[in-house]
Every structure is written in structure tokens, then in C-alpha cells.
Amino acid sequence: MTINCVWEHNGRDTLLYAVDFVGAYTRGETLEAAVRKMQAEICSYLKWCGKKAVTSMDIVIIEEKVSELAICDADSDVLFESEKAPLTAEEYIKLKALALKSAQDFLALYDSVPDKNATAAPERKTFYGQVPRTANEMYEHTKNVNTYYFAEIAVDADHDGNIYECRKRGFESLESNPDFLQNTVRKGSYGEDWSLRKVLRRF
């Protein structure tokens, strides 16, 4: 199987995205390190989707983005060329279902943690502040980006309630715009380009 990838890097650290497996990515200190992790990532992704794993794959870099961001902290601003194209209704329904499944599964994982304030991780500061260390901090951080991501594509959303509920409401707000499938590319915060396809990948 050929895995088409977008390579985002700052000359040191790498983020490698599998274009046709929306949301799948690896990170490494080098491109080679990220490539080595990709087969396990794709197999895990396919299992999560209820599909069969693959036994062999070829990694092909189809796009490169040189960045000045802190890639080692998963800071990213890339917009794939493929994320500029309009969506069909069928594509949107499929990608929305994945984004909602992700929220639902994340909530189930969070709910399964007995002590949501326990941590064994050391304190560490990144571009956005302290790294979330407890289950509660990780959950709140992930839930709270709902407002931010939707706002970047001019959609009014919130992060009230649980992560699934607020994400579902965000999509309902998006769908009130009759032209949302046009996938307009917008200049968001810090000069970063955003589209609906990018938001779906980031979720």
C-alpha cells in the first residue's frame, strides 16, 4: 500500500501526515524516525476504523512544508493542498462521523480513568503554556479547542458540556451555512490558513 504523506518540519523535528487517513500522523526528531513509526500508526488507525491492518507500505512524500514552529511540541500550521478543494456531501458525512467518533472515544477513555488528577509526568512548558499532565487537564485542553477550531472557519461554537456534545453542536452550527461544503480557505489567527477539511483533520 502506498501512503501519501505531507512532511512538515523546521529543519530539525518532523511531523508526517498520512493524507488519505485523515488525522493519522507521526512525529520524530528526523524524517526517518517519523517514517519508521508510520506503519504502526496506520495499522492502529485502521483498527480504530474497524478495518483490516496492512502488512507492508511505501511512504511517499507528496508535499513539504518548512516551518518555524515548535514541531517537537506538535505545533503545526500546515494546510495541505488537498485541503483546499470543496467537499462532496458524502465526503463530509464520512469525515464528520470520524470527528464525532474521535470525540466519543476520547470521552469514553477519559471516563474510564479512576483518578483524573493523578500524574507521573514532569512539568514542561510549551508554546501554549504548561503541558497537560493529568487526565483532567488533557481532556479540558482537547475539549476547549472546539471553540478555537470552529472560529477559525467563521463558525460560532462553544465548549460547554462534554467533548462530544460541543463538537456535535459545532457541526450543527456549521451546517446552518448553505455554502459550507465549498470549503472556503480563511486566514485565521496568527496568519494561519484554515479550511473545513483542515478542521476535520485536526479533530
Regions picked out by a protein language model, each given a short descriptive name:
Residues 1-203:
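Aromatic-glycine hotspot motif
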